[in-house]
């Protein structure tokens, strides 16, 4: 049985140049056919399922009005890019003007209310820094305002 089988050399060994000189025409044809199969286009084609396209989250608007009030895109801070900072000032000038107008219109506290708050503040801070014996000299009004009690200094007659 062992004698019936002929040992064959590997394909890689037969492809080497020095081995091809002594090969038969049949084995040469077989090697060429195998090489053609390896190099053919079908060999390099990948049988992968087609990739699904990802859902696009693009929203299309008919009008460009949404883009009108946007700030200028390029930004620079602390003098890093002076040219861009100049452009920022020009492009964002109208937004700053609108913000300044909004700040002047909004008054959180009126002048009268500020004056009342200042009066109460003077009393509370005065009480905070007063000496211990002077703490008793402060009293609260019905509004919760703390005011100092100033006792008039008068001459006391000595009693006989």
Curated annotation (Swiss-Prot):
Keyword line: Cytoplasm, Isopeptide bond, Nucleus, Phosphoprotein, RNA-binding, rRNA processing, Ubl conjugation
InterPro entries according to UniProt: MPP6
GO molecular function: RNA binding
Modified residues (Phosphothreonine): 147
GO CC terms: cytosol; exosome (RNase complex); nucleolus; nucleoplasm; nucleus
Record PTM Phosphoserine, positions in chain: 110
Known partners and oligomeric status: Associates with the RNA exosome complex, mediated by EXOSC3. Interacts with ARHGAP18. Interacts with exosome cofactors EXOSC10 and MTREX.
Function of the molecule: RNA-binding protein that associates with the RNA exosome complex. Involved in the 3'-processing of the 7S pre-RNA to the mature 5.8S rRNA and play a role in recruiting the RNA exosome complex to pre-rRNA; this function may include C1D.
Name of this protein: M-phase phosphoprotein 6
Source species of the chain: Homo sapiens (Human)
């Amino acid at each position: 049985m062992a004698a019936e089988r002929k040992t064959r050399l590997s394909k890689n060994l037969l492809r080497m140049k020095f081995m091809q000189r002594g090969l038969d025409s049949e084995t040469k044809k077989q090697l060429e056919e195998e090489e053609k199969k390896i190099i053919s286009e079908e060999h390099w084609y990948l049988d992968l399922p087609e990739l699904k396209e990802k859902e696009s989250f693009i929203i299309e608007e008919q009008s460009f009005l949404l883009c009108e009030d946007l700030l200028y895109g390029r930004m620079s801070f602390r003098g890093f890019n002076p040219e861009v900072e100049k452009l920022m000032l020009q492009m964002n000038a109208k937004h700053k003007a609108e913000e300044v107008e909004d700040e002047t219109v909004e008054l959180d506290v009126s002048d009268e209310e500020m004056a009342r708050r200042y009066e109460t503040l003077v009393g509370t801070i005065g009480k905070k820094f007063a000496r211990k014996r002077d703490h008793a000299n402060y009293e609260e009004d019905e509004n919760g305002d703390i005011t100092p009690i100033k006792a008039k200094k008068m001459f006391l007659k000595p009693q006989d």
